[in-house]
Amino acid sequence: MAKPFEKINDINKMKELWKIAVKVHHQWTVISNNKEHIELIFVDANGTDVHVILPTTLKATFDSVLFVNNTYTVTNFLPQINDLMFKTSEHPFVIRFIAGTRVSDINKHEIPGKRLNFKPFSEIISGNWRNDLLVDVIGLVEEIGYKHMSAGSKKQQVNLILKDLV
C-alpha cells in the first residue's frame, strides 16, 4: 500500500521519512562564498508554505527538475528549525534536501497557487508585524531615492518611496 501524503503543517523533527505533494511557488539562487545553492518556497493543497534549501552539492541534480508553478511529490528530506534571519514562511521548520531526497510525479497534483497575504502600509508603519518575517506588499513606486555602494562591496543600495494603493 502506498504511503499517504502528509501536510506541510505536520512537518517536524520527530521523524525523517516524509511524503508531501507540493507546488513550487518561488525559486531563487543564493551565492555565498563563491558557491551557489537553490532556495524555494513550497505550498501544499491547504495553502501552507515552507522554505526549502537545496545545498550546493545537490544543485545540479535538481536545478533542471524543479520549476515554479509545477507540482511534485517530494520524499525523504530533513526538517530543520527555521532559524533564518529573514523568514519567507511562518512555518517553524525549513526543508533541507539530502542525498536521499526524491522528487517525482511532475504535475500530477492539483494544487492552487500560494495565497498572498498583503500587509497594509499602516500596519508596517505602526510596527504591527514580525520583523523577521518577509511580508507581501503592493504599492506604487512614487520616487527613487539616492543610490550608494555598500562599503567594501559591489552591492548597490537603492531607496524607494512607495505609495500605498489601499
Question: Where are the predicted features?
Answer:
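Single-stranded nucleic acid-binding proteins centered on OB/S1-type folds
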Residues: 1-166
